Amino acid sequence: MPRSLKKGPFIDLHLLKKVEKAVESGDKKPIKTWSRRSMIIPTMIGLTIAVHNGRQHVPVFVTDEMIGHKLGEFAPTRTYRGHAADKKAKKR
């Protein structure tokens, strides 16, 4: 179920302060964050945000199509290496 419109988008305050500071100064350095739950807002367009995936920070360049999505959607947490090969089929 989506978030109520009367509540507005959720964004952690510490991340919002970092974004506003970067926009104000014109800084292009990636902003490190662990806040995967924060929503992407229009002031973030053009910034690179390094989102933590549990192991490392994945750089995410924010574009206008990403507005309304969460930061965690763009930093996958699981790596799929494929299923194990069938050893019986290889012998024949």
UniProtKB/Swiss-Prot annotation:
<comment type="similarity">
    <text>Belongs to the universal ribosomal protein uS19 family.</text>
</comment>
<dbReference type="InterPro" id="IPR023575">
    <property type="entry name" value="Ribosomal_uS19_SF"/>
</dbReference>
<keyword id="KW-0687">Ribonucleoprotein</keyword>
<dbReference type="Pfam" id="PF00203">
    <property type="entry name" value="Ribosomal_S19"/>
</dbReference>
<dbReference type="GO" id="GO:0006412">
    <property type="term" value="P:translation"/>
</dbReference>
<keyword id="KW-0694">RNA-binding</keyword>
<dbReference type="GO" id="GO:0000028">
    <property type="term" value="P:ribosomal small subunit assembly"/>
</dbReference>
<keyword id="KW-0699">rRNA-binding</keyword>
<dbReference type="InterPro" id="IPR002222">
    <property type="entry name" value="Ribosomal_uS19"/>
</dbReference>
<keyword id="KW-0689">Ribosomal protein</keyword>
<comment type="function">
    <text>Protein S19 forms a complex with S13 that binds strongly to the 16S ribosomal RNA.</text>
</comment>
<dbReference type="GO" id="GO:0015935">
    <property type="term" value="C:small ribosomal subunit"/>
</dbReference>
<dbReference type="GO" id="GO:0003735">
    <property type="term" value="F:structural constituent of ribosome"/>
</dbReference>
<dbReference type="GO" id="GO:0005737">
    <property type="term" value="C:cytoplasm"/>
</dbReference>
<dbReference type="InterPro" id="IPR005732">
    <property type="entry name" value="Ribosomal_uS19_bac-type"/>
</dbReference>
<dbReference type="GO" id="GO:0019843">
    <property type="term" value="F:rRNA binding"/>
</dbReference>
<dbReference type="InterPro" id="IPR020934">
    <property type="entry name" value="Ribosomal_uS19_CS"/>
</dbReference>
<protein>
    <recommendedName>
        <fullName>Small ribosomal subunit protein uS19</fullName>
    </recommendedName>
</protein>
